């Protein structure tokens, strides 16, 4: 049997990089489920989006690192458990291990039964902040992947228009490439203030970036 030594070397290099990543180590130390928590943390510390008493909706929440960060923001003690000053509703197509104080809804938020659960969780109100770390399964085809990424961002924007307060904020993940300029234009059409941010915790070689839209037009 022929062994692909190049592939094995690449996998080993990635594993070494992952194990030695300071954000991976920090996540383990701080009790976060993924290093992604620090991306939202950087964005939030820069823009002060998540405040005590806020209602936050986390789209594409699994495994839950962003919800964990939000939970700590809304805790009077900054704790992972205990009292909570605010509301967190997380949605994903995949199951998520429970987080104390976080209401999780399993399903596609485009479907009526799931939307009904969300509206019930919101108690007739709207979100102060919507965060979306949604990402598609990538095919390797640039055109196809750009379209999939664009669709998820567009869905998050549409969700915010209908379920977020006028003065609220939306954070989405996207990637530089095919549809990037069009998505920035969509944000500028939708929000009063638009800020592209590349957190330090995003990997250097990644084309990943984040867009923040504040205040619906």
Swiss-Prot record:
Alphabetical list of InterPro entries matching this protein: RNA_methyltr_RlmE, RNA_MeTrfase_FtsJ_dom, rRNA-MeTfrase_E, SAM-dependent_MTases_sf
One GO MF term attached to the UniProt entry: rRNA (uridine-2'-O-)-methyltransferase activity
GO cellular component terms attached to this protein's record: cytoplasm
Keywords: Cytoplasm, Methyltransferase, rRNA processing, S-adenosyl-L-methionine, Transferase
Chief place of localization: cytoplasm
Gene3D superfamilies linked to this entry: Vaccinia Virus protein VP39
EC number: 2.1.1.166
Reactions catalysed according to its record: uridine(2552) in 23S rRNA + S-adenosyl-L-methionine = 2'-O-methyluridine(2552) in 23S rRNA + S-adenosyl-L-homocysteine + H(+)
Positions that bind S-adenosyl-L-methionine: 64, 66, 92, 108, 133
Annotated SUPFAM superfamilies: S-adenosyl-L-methionine-dependent methyltransferases
Residues the record marks as active site: 173
Pfam family, one: FtsJ
Subcellular location: Cytoplasm
UniProt function note: Specifically methylates the uridine in position 2552 of 23S rRNA at the 2'-O position of the ribose in the fully assembled 50S ribosomal subunit.
HAMAP family assigned to the protein according to its UniProt record, in alphabetical order: RNA_methyltr_E
Protein family: Belongs to the class I-like SAM-binding methyltransferase superfamily. RNA methyltransferase RlmE family.
Name of the molecule in the record: Ribosomal RNA large subunit methyltransferase E
Gene (UniProt): rlmE
